[in-house]
C-alpha cells in the first residue's frame, strides 16, 4: 500500500508540473512535456504498478482532457495564473480542472457581453446623434478589446466635436423684400428699438424676436461703417461722394431723396439761410439728428476754404474761373472742365466757386486734383498743413 501511495504522489506531482509549465508557456498541446515522459517511464519499474495501471491511465486521460479544454478556453489575456496547491487525491484534481475551465468559460462569455466593437460604438453614437440630437462618449471597453475600444472612443470623440460644431452653426435668415422694407422704415424712425416694439415687429413680420434684435444690431454697424467711410479724413472726391449718395438714394438705401448736385452735409456749416435752403432743397423740415449721413460734417474748422463745396447761390460771381491776379481757378469744378473753355466750364459745372473769397495760399487737396497736375502749375499747388 505504501508503494502505491508513493506512485500516486509521483504521478500527481508530474501532472501538476506539466499543467503549470504549459500554462506559463501558453502551449496549445497538452501532451509532450519531458517531465510527463519521465513519469511515464517510471511507471513500469514499480512491481506493484501493473494492476492499477488502467485506473491511473483513465484518470490521467481525464486530467489531460480537462487541461486541453482549459487551455483552449483560457486564451483571453485576462486569465490569472495562481500557484496550484497539490490535492490529496487525483479525483479532486480532475474536479478542480473542470471548475477552473468552467470559471474561465464564464469569464470569457461575460467579457464578450460587456465589450463593444468600434462598429457598435459608431452605430450607437450615430443613432444617439440622429435620434436625440446629443452626442456622448461611450464607456471604455474591457481589456480584451482595449485597443479597439480606444479607437472607437477616438471616433466617437470626433463625432462629438462634429455634433458640437453642427449645434454651434448658425444659418442666415433670408428676409423678403417686404420684411426688409418694414425693418428699414423702423430703423429710419428709431435706431434702437425697445423690446415691446421688437415683439410687435416680430408678430407683424412673422420673425423671431431674436432675429429682429440681431438685424438691428447689424444695421447699426453697417450705418457706422458708412459714416466712417465717408468722413475719414474727408471725401476725397466730391463727385464720387455725390455719385455714391445718388446711387444710395436711387436704390432705396436712403429713406429720403437726395439731390445729385448738393452735398448737403457741408452746407450746415456755411450759414445758409432757411429761405435759400428751402429753395435749393426739397426738404421741408431738417433732417433727424441720428440720420445716416447727418454726421458727415467736415473735420476742418474753416469749411469755407473748400471752394468745391460752396453753394452756387452764395458764391457765384462773374469772376469765376479766375484767381487773384488773373490766375486760373484750381477748384475741382474748374479743373474737371478745363478742356472745354471758360464759358462752357461755368455753365456745365455742378460746383461753382469764387476766387475772391478763396485764400491765395489754399488749394483743394484731393486725389482728383493731384492726378491733373499737368494743368496746374507748381506755384498754384501749395500744400497747407491741415489743422486737426
From Swiss-Prot:
Keyword Transcription regulation: yes
Main localization of the protein described in the UniProt heading: nucleus
Cellular component aspect of the GO annotation: nucleus
DNA-binding region residue numbers: 168-227
Keyword match Nucleus: yes
GO BP, sorted A to Z: regulation of transcription by RNA polymerase II
Subcellular location: Nucleus
Residue span of region Disordered: 30-109, 131-163
Keyword vocabulary terms for this entry: Developmental protein, DNA-binding, Homeobox, Nucleus, Transcription, Transcription regulation
Compositionally biased region (Polar residues): 68-81, 91-103
An annotated Gene Ontology molecular function: RNA polymerase II cis-regulatory region sequence-specific DNA binding
Stretches assigned to coiled coil: none
Alphabetical list of Pfam families matching this protein: Homeodomain
Function: May be required for posterior development and development of normal embryonic axial pattern.
Family: Belongs to the even-skipped homeobox family.
Protein name in UniProt: Homeobox protein XHOX-3
